[in-house]
Amino acid sequence: MAKLSLFERRRQRVRSALRKRSGDKPRLSVHRTGKHIYAQVIDDADGKTLAAASTLGAKGSGANVDAAAKVGKDIAAAAKKAGVTTVVFDRGGFLFHGRVKALADAAREGGLEF
């Protein structure tokens, strides 16, 4: 078995815990890079993306807490438009701090429940 990085081990641990308790709820998946942040609402049963939002194409920096909060509001609005109100939050191996936390808080304020 190949050695996994700390991030990959954390991601596997988070995803396996989500699979056990998510049931049939869609998953709000977050991906963070040095320049941008991405969010998707994914229906794992059908393997389809129901809603998506990111900082791509936005003016200014996409790598700060304010940009992450805007993505959180955008993903909440897109999920509501798709008929989704309850999700399971998938931080994807990233620590729940900073930009990831800002996105989650803004999505909750936007009406998503998790």
Curated annotation (Swiss-Prot):
GO terms of molecular function: 5S rRNA binding; structural constituent of ribosome
SUPFAM superfamilies: Translational machinery components
Keywords: Ribonucleoprotein, Ribosomal protein, RNA-binding, rRNA-binding
Any one Pfam family match given in the protein's UniProt record, by short name: Ribosomal_L18p
Annotated Gene Ontology cellular component terms: cytosolic large ribosomal subunit
InterPro entries hit by this protein: Ribosomal_uL18_bac-type, Ribosomal_uL18_bac/euk
Highest taxon, organism lineage: Bacteria
GO terms classed as biological process: translation
Role according to the record: This is one of the proteins that bind and probably mediate the attachment of the 5S RNA into the large ribosomal subunit, where it forms part of the central protuberance.
Family: Belongs to the universal ribosomal protein uL18 family.
Subunit structure: Part of the 50S ribosomal subunit; part of the 5S rRNA/L5/L18/L25 subcomplex. Contacts the 5S and 23S rRNAs.
UniProt-recorded name of the protein: Large ribosomal subunit protein uL18
Lineage per the UniProt record: Bacteria, Pseudomonadati, Pseudomonadota, Alphaproteobacteria, Sphingomonadales
Underlying gene: rplR
